[in-house]
Structure formats: C-alpha cells, structure tokens
Amino acid sequence: PHHTTSAVALVGGGSIPRPGEISLAHHGVLFLDELPEFPRKVLEVLREPLESREIMISRVNAQSRFPANFQLIAAMNPCPCGFLGSSRCRCTPDQVRRYKDKISGPLLDRIDLQVEVPHLPSEKLIQTKTEGKGIDCESSAEVYQRVKTARQHQLNRAGKLNALMSNQEVMEHCTLDNETKDLLNRAIQKLGLTARGF
C-alpha cells in the first residue's frame, strides 16, 4: 500500500466491515515502503494485529474478526533526504530525530529484525566476486536451503515455527546456557531492549 493509505484501508473497516491490506496479506508479506511517510495514526493500528495475528473491527451492531498473520517488511530512508552520512545530506540532527520519531517505540518493539543498509559506492555494486573485490553473496538457492533447514529445525523441536511459540513454549524448548544468558543480558543493556522487544 501507498503511504497515503488510510487506517481503514490498511486494517479493514467500513459500515459493513471488510478486510484491509493486513488481512489480504494473511500468510504472506505486507510491504510498507517509506514507513515514516505513513501517518502515525495509520501505523499505530498495526500494533494489535502484529501481536495477536488478527484484527477485531467493532461496529455498533457487531464485531468482525479478520485473520492478519502476516510478515511485515518495512523500508525507510536514514533521514528525510535519504543521504545521511553523505556530503549530499542537508538534514539537521533535529530533522533526522523528528523523522525517526515518526515511528513509535511500541511499534518498533514489534518489528523483530531491523537492519541498517549502508550506502555502497557504485563501483562496489558493479564489481563481481570473480574480480576478487566484489561483494561476497550467497545465491538464492543457498539462502533457500538455509531457511528451509532452519524452519525444519524449528518444526522438529517444537512442532511449530518460533514465531508461533507461546512464552511457555519458548521457556520449555529454548533453554539457554550461562554464556548465552550473559550475552543476552549485555545486549538488553546495550540496545535498551524493552520486555516486548526482548
């Protein structure tokens, strides 16, 4: 959906409730490009379905429940102009902070994996691995095999994917040794993780 999409179009609604984009993406991917450009009110309606994997739409006469088990993938620039860290960037630190603050902490807590993609010079992008200087990339087939193996490991261990495990099941199937607990504790401190984010 485009960043001008309304909350009703995104999660569903109307006088006769109809499913929105999140239900249409059930068991699939919902991609939101230019995330901070969406109105904050629209983004905040994602919090409930990201947690419960469904959306409840209440009207005077009835409530409608729609499935919403989707994988959210969102993209954003590092600053309003998109050139943070480059001589082309003219954004002030305050503009960068306001831009990033358009996405609330509670919504960010529900996004499990956040990756910053650094700017790469064009010569790096066009170099090939065979030239000895290019970016070392896995083929799609290699990535597919790693993902397939990881999913099978999860299914063998708990009978379901990690994302579908309850807190109790995580405690039962994902026991940690002391070294791992120490690493996680340091990560919580360093990254400022909340209980939900952890």
Predicted regions and their residues:
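Conserved alpha-helical scaffold flanking the Walker A/P-loop in AAA+ ATPase domains
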Residues: T5-L30, Q63
